[in-house]
């Protein structure tokens, strides 16, 4: 609670320092006049009301107001704008304001930034917003429930430089004048119901720097442009058209976008090959063409000098990697999962010196896992699962440091200047209140990785810390290298569904950070090392379907694992398996007994085969004689045989499709 003695107070900032506002804070008339108030994330649930504190009714000199993320309810307090004629910035995002949005018809010329995003506002965006705030520079209305069309008056606001209407229920066509006005660097219309053709908007986007049209209903082809006469707008740095209904071939004219930094065309219906013109995108840092129907091979010339993140998963690309990405020392993420790529991992993979995330899952790569991977000191996530790799696991993989990599996060930067304070005027500048909130880019680097028996998406700071190796569902042979125990920073290790033999290395006890360890479906033998009880972070553990024997550890984390973690190992024993270790036969004893039984069974099998063959011949002769004598039975027999053949044929077709659609190893 604020003391009344603060009569000379002009600036109140208490961000994220939980304040408990007493009744007087809502009812009393303050003795101070503020110029800046910033109370983001600071009002606790112990207060008496969820309404905006009434002491603000008596403030008339406010320049900047930030009441974000406090769960205030009721209607939007537009009286803050009406009472404070010098107000420049208003941030009310992350609350629970409801109802339609309406503003006074009076001119308020000083307001340049308004953020009412992440609330529960409904209805249409008021057209009066343009006349009330003619010099508005930044408007954020995202994550509400606004519907209808974009007000045409926004097209005439010459000072508007940042417009975010994303995550609403807006529909119709995007006004072309909004794009062509030439002074709107950042336009975000993501996740609405806009429709129409996006090509004219891109062609005329002079002055637009970041264009986000993802998550809408834009449709049609993007190829109807004369490449020889077309000049790509030099201002466009970033385009996001993902999650729309675009189809046809990828536009060759994109190759003219020499200033383009980031391009996202994922989750559409593009088909055909990747145009050679994409090789001319020399400024490209981020490319996402995933989840389309692209085919053909990756152009060998595709090697942008500054490329950092490449996502082309979920297509039908084929062929070897050849020289694509060769010597791309800047590349951090290479995601080629879910294609039909063949061949081996090229020896030049070590030239990707900055590579941190390598995802080649679900392709047709073969050959050995190359030791050149061990030279990539920035590697922290490797997924080579569901391929046809063979041979031993390189022991040098244990030398990888798996470092934390902030480079895995897509750099966004911030719009405007950093927070500053004008101590002479004892107030924060407008940029200090508004600009520090909003990133320059809304594209986020997110990767999918299988761990803990499930698919997980990693992005942001979590991606920086995530480390893992997945070599499952291949044909790897030999022993598990004890050197893998040196991967002390690894969180997930999956070697399942291979043909590995030998014992589980006791050195795995040094995997102090590991949360998921899967060694199932191999030919491992011996006992589970008791030293593994030292793995205090282990959450998921499986050695199912091996040839392990002896008692299972039951201390620490191993007391939490269920029977499924050990199934398919008949010689394991322990409380979890409801099998006493004092009564179980050893593998060697049971093996000897089985061999003795096999010798006796050989004579029985011979006698059985002779008698079965004689009976079978007699049965066939009897059926032949009966069918020859009786024509009615003969027709019935042929009809039955025809039905059986038809059923067998369709049954085999169904099994074939099932086998190829649903892989055994997932």
PLM features: residue spans?
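Terminal membrane/secretory targeting segments in land-plant proteins
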Residues: 581-666
């Amino acid at each position: 609670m604020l003391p009344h003695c603060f009569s000379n107070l002009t600036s109140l900032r208490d961000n994220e320092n939980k304040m408990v506002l007493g009744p007087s804070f809502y009812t009393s008339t303050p003795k101070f006049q503020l110029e800046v108030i910033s109370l983001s994330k600071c009002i606790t649930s112990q207060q008496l009301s969820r309404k905006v504190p009434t002491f603000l009714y008596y403030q008339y000199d406010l320049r900047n107001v930030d009441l974000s993320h406090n769960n205030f309810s009721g209607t939007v307090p537009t009286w803050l704008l009406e009472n404070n004629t010098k107000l420049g910035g208003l941030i009310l995002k992350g609350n629970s304001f409801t109802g339609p949005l309406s503003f006074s018809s009076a001119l308020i010329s000083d307001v340049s930034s308004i953020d009412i995003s992440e609330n529960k506002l409904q209805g249409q965006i008021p057209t009066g917003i343009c006349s009330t705030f003619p010099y508005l520079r930044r408007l954020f209305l995202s994550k509400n429930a606004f519907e209808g069309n974009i007000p045409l008056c926004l097209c005439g606001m010459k000072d508007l430089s940042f417009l975010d209407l994303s995550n609403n229920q807006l529909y119709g066509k995007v006004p072309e004048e909004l794009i062509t006005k030439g002074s709107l660097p950042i336009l975000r219309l993501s996740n609405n119901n806009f429709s129409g053709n996006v090509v004219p908007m891109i062609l005329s986007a002079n002055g637009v720097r970041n264009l986000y049209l993802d998550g809408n209903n834009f449709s049609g082809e993007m190829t109807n442009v004369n490449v020889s006469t077309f000049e790509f707008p030099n201002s466009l740095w970033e385009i996001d058209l993902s999650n729309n209904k675009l189809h046809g071939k990828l536009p060759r004219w994109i190759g003219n976008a020499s200033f383009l930094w980031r391009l996202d065309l994922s989750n559409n219906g593009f088909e055909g090959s990747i145009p050679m013109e994409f090789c001319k995108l020399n400024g490209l840092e981020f490319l996402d063409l995933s989840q389309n129907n692209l085919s053909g091979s990756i152009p060998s010339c595709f090697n942008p000098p500054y490329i950092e993140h490449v996502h082309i998963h979920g297509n039908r690309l084929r062929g070897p990697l050849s020289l694509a990405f060769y010597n791309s020392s800047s590349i951090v993420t290479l995601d080629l999962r879910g294609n039909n790529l063949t061949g081996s991992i090229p020896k030049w993979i070590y030239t990707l010196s900055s590579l941190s995330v390598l995802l080649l899952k679900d392709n047709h790569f073969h050959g050995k896992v190359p030791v050149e991977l061990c030279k990539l000191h920035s590697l922290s996530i490797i997924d080579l699962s569901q391929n046809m790799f063979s041979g031993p696991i390189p022991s040098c993989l244990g030398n990888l440091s798996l470092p934390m990599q902030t480079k895995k996060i897509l750099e966004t930067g911030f719009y405007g200047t950093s927070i500053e304070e004008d101590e002479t005027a004892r107030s924060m500048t407008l940029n200090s209140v508004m600009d520090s909130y909003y990133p320059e880019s809304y594209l986020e680097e997110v990767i999918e990785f299988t761990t803990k028996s499930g698919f997980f998406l990693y992005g942001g700071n979590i991606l920086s810390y995530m480390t893992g190796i997945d070599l499952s569902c291949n044909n790897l042979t030999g022993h598990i290298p004890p050197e893998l125990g040196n991967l002390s920073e690894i969180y997930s290790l999956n070697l399942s569904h291979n043909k590995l033999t030998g014992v589980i290395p006791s050195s795995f006890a040094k995997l102090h950070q590991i949360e998921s360890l899967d060694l199932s479906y191999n030919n491992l033998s011996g006992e589970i090392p008791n030293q593994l009880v030292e793995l205090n972070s282990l959450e998921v553990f499986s050695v199912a379907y091996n040839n392990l024997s002896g008692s299972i550890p039951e201390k620490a984390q191993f007391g939490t694992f269920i029977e499924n973690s050990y199934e398919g190992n008949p010689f394991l024993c322990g409380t979890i398996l409801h099998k006493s270790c004092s009564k179980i036969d050893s593998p060697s004893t049971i093996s000897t007994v089985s061999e003795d039984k096999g010798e006796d069974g050989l004579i029985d099998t011979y006698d059985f085969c002779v008698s079965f063959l004689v009976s079978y011949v007699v049965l066939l002769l009897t059926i032949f004689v009966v069918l020859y004598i009786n024509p009615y039975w003969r027709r019935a027999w042929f009809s039955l045989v025809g039905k059986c053949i038809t059923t067998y044929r369709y049954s085999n077709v169904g099994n074939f499709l099932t086998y190829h659609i649903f892989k055994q190893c997932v």
